[in-house]
From Swiss-Prot:
NCBIfam families: F_box_assoc_1. InterPro entries: F-box-assoc_dom_typ1, F-box-assoc_interact_dom, F-box-like_dom_sf, F-box_dom, SCF_F-box_component. Pfam families: F-box (PF00646), FBA_1 (PF07734). The lineage of its organism: Eukaryota, Viridiplantae, Streptophyta, Embryophyta, Tracheophyta. Residues 1-45 form the F-box domain. This is Putative F-box protein At3g16820. It comes from the Eukaryota.
Length: 313
């Protein structure tokens, strides 16, 4: 029997065991397999199985380091029984070090949208309802919208002046910014803060006040264009960890809800020649994992949330 003559249910069973990242190679096997692998019902089934497997044993994240973007597998299975966690490279997705193009972004002065279909930029005029704001840190995407840390200089009654920090959301449907979204803490630029989207479901904040050794992780339990509420996911006193090595100035992180662990990416302090991952739990759990050598002393690893998908880029 030729491979193209196999019954559909058997083909789907075979394809369902193939990692999402390897489907392109499998599609070239034969025309029938290519058609089935792109079918909507199979796609939903395959992605559902991938999500279930991730929840049971491990999950995947996208990490940018050394001008390259990698898909990486994170395994926390058995950490309650003193089994060391791991972060393993799955594949390289893209390389940026040979690019001769650069995007110049001035968020204080203007907002532009790049359209991939038309390969063009669109300038958005008067998109900010409250006038000039300053945006800082990397933005994150959640359910089709983009969120940034922002701040605005405010003069209160009586002449008192201060920077007020908050989140701001850009709605790609209306091409407008929404109102301010409150943070669960009072933030100043002297403190360390980082934003993450968790599997296209929630926003996650890492907060480290400069005057304490406490690290806080906050997760959104309600997120809308005009409102957000937060719950504290984790609070850790970092002074309790004798191997506390990382700084929070270039912090990038992700969380695992099941094991209540945060993973912070950074470089070693002495030479900045190694990329490291720090696994931290609220019960005193602390592990350091090597992510490989680094030739770029000023380039810090950065993590993106990853949701399994069969969509081709």
């Amino acid at each position: 029997m030729a491979i193209s003559d196999l019954p559909r249910d058997l083909v789907e069973e075979v394809l369902s065991r193939v990692p999402v990242t390897s489907l392109r190679t499998v599609r070239s096997t034969c025309k029938k397999w290519n058609i089935i692998s792109k079918d909507e019902s199979f796609t939903k089934k395959h992605v559902g199985q991938a999500n279930a497997a991730a929840r049971e044993s491990e999950f995947q994240v996208v990490i940018m380091t050394e001008y390259k973007v990698y898909l990486m597998s994170v395994n926390l299975h058995g950490i309650q029984n003193n089994v060391d966690p791991s972060i393993e490279f799955k594949c390289k997705l893209i390389s940026l070090d040979d690019s001769d193009r650069i995007v110049d972004f001035h968020p204080v002065y203007e907002t532009e949208i790049y359209n991939f279909h038309s390969d063009s930029w669109k300038n958005i005029v008067d998109s900010t309802p409250e006038g000039d704001m300053q945006y800082f840190k990397q933005g994150v995407s959640l359910k089709g919208n983009t969120y940034w840390f922002a701040r605005k200089y405010v003069i209160y009654e009586g002449g008192q002046e201060a920077w007020v920090s908050f989140l701001i959301c850009f709605d790609f449907t209306t091409e407008r910014f929404g109102p301010r979204l409150t943070l669960p803490f009072d933030y100043s630029t002297k403190e360390s803060v980082s934003l993450l989207s968790a599997r296209e479901e929630q926003l996650v904040l890492l907060y480290h006040p400069w005057f304490t050794m406490m690290m806080e992780i906050w997760v959104s339990n309600k997120i809308e264009l005009n409102a957000v509420s937060w719950i504290k996911f984790l609070e850790v006193n970092m002074i309790t960890f004798p191997h506390y090595r990382f700084s929070f100035h270039h912090v990038s992180f992700f969380i695992d809800k099941k094991n209540k662990v945060v993973v912070v990416l950074d470089k070693d302090k002495e030479t900045r020649s190694r990329n490291l991952g720090y696994f931290i739990g609220d019960d005193g759990y602390f592990k350091e994992v090597e992510l490989g050598g680094s030739r770029d002393r000023n380039g810090y690893p950065f993590v993106f949330s990853y949701v399994p998908s069969s969509v081709q880029f």
